[in-house]
Amino acid sequence: MKNITYIISIILLGFVSVSCQKDLDQNPIDPDSFTQQDVFANAQQAKGALAKVYASLALTGQQGPAGQPDISDIDEGFSQFSRMLFNLNELTTDHAVIAWGDPGLQDLHGMYWTAGNDFTDAMYYRLAQTVSFANSFIENAEDLNSDQEVKYFIAEARFIRAYAYYNLMDLYANVPLVTKISTELPTQSNRQEIFDFVESELLDIQDKLKDSGTNEYGRVDKVAAWALLSRLYLNAETWIGTPRYNDCVHFSELAMNSSYHINTNDANGNGSAYDELFLADNNMNGAQNEFIFELNFDGQHSQTYGGTTFLIHAAVGGSMQPGDYGINGGWFGSRTTKNLVNKFGNADISALNNSIGGTVSNWGLVGDATPNGWSGPDVQMYETATNEYALYIELTSGSIKFRYDNNWGQNYGDTGADGTLDNGGDNIAIANPGIYFVTMDLNNMTYTIAPYKSDARAMFYTDGQSLEITDVSQFNEGYAVTKFKNIDVNGNQGSDSSGSFADTDLPLIRLAEVYLNYAEATLRGGNGSISTAVDKINELRTRAYGSNSGNITASDLNLDFVLDERSRELYWEGLRRTDLIRYGYFTSGSYLWPFKGNEANGTGVDSYRKIFPLPNNVIAINPNLQQNPGY
């Protein structure tokens, strides 16, 4: 599929069955027996054709994970949309490195790709094919347009086409705009023209899509149009030179006020509801209520070497146990750089203690587990109510006691190790180093010592992995990312008993992103509310920390904070390159990461790398097209 004008009809390609319990409810169509009239004879048959439009973003061909690929000249597994989105939007940034030596792959993180790169070409072909499928569906389904359900189908196909063009505009900028089946060579459109098309399509279909939450899981409703408009307008100033932050705020608000909501269901009981978003049962564990547009995967019925199968397998290696992630083996590929790890940083103990309230008291902690040791002085606690005290403190392995005014005349330990204070009692053991929240209640003569819950979004495997990277081809250099897993909330492996293919669905747009769009647009001059922005970000951080201990105030909210929060919340979800470009950090020397510009410590690169080259084959076929600058 080497030409956007080489229109492949859905009728000629046939259909793959992507029907499964968590996918579009459709009857599979035998690709060897149907005719065009059969496929579009009624709404139910048309729904099968619509499934192919959706599946063009999830699957790679007509014969399971390999055998009859939609796109040639690249390994079929590499050709899946979200796998290529990872390669172009995450691997090119501080979020990811990969160990493999496939030709052209290391060029992406090193930022020295050229025209003809297999991966930049294949993404163009994949998106062009999605446009082709959508165009074919829209034209052929028009004959059934009197059926209300088919009207919804057409609006959904238009959304998928707009989403494909959104990505073509982001990645390649200047592409042909093709909306009808045609054999004529199209002219080249610029970014403004593509932007205008995507905007007009989304605005037109917002009231033609189903209402919020009324469509079946796996199909979009009008909130998807609002959320994509939110993303579009956030990038408008970067792409077309015109700020559209008020519009970003408006459509973000529509999405935020819809039936979708942030998942707060900690179904596996580990203290945070964040990880549920990326488990094998994320279509039913509560995460689905946050997913506005997602790719559905099923380890038995919609197999691919892309999607979450890639994200999970490629990130497992070294001393990691594949079974812990619901798979049969790791591919020893993807890791992250210290830049992402350091976004989570160390807890600000001073800020945590300021959040306690109350006043500094004469009671404190002493012991070899404290920073000052047994010789003191005591680390003073805060009196939060009469005879009630609290403190965040970093402790080492050892022992502590409570002491008054640096004087052993009044001290408390715990002789029975039962949480009860005893005057002059035994030392209180601290088994593991870390940050703790310590309380003392002299009204009831009790105390608590609880580990501080850090940001649960920091999902890294560090055993045998170095933080520093000197050779990207070595899997043990760089922390492994454990964000995606093929296990459910009960720890059970996905439906593929072999452990080869994942059930985990992949969110392409979720409500958390819209929250962050709103905050950034407000800070950039949009007519949103700073108070609302803080509240929405604190929703995300409360989920991440399992409490309000990580919450921020308006004084903490600035553009760089939002960028870092986007990194913490959305890493490996296909947005990082676009974010860095919007902030002016992608190609510049002002923000570096390991092997940016193919140098160990990173270096700036030419600004033309903000967009990728058009495929040489496309330009050779179509004399109307010019290569992007720099290539």
Where do the protein language model's features map onto the residues?
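Short coil/turn linking the two alpha-helices of tandem helical-hairpin repeats
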Residues: 169-170, 176, 235-241, 524-527
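Hydrophobic, small-residue-rich alpha-helical packing segments that form membrane-like cores
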Residues: 181-238, 243-266
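Insoluble glucan recognition modules
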Residues: 356-451
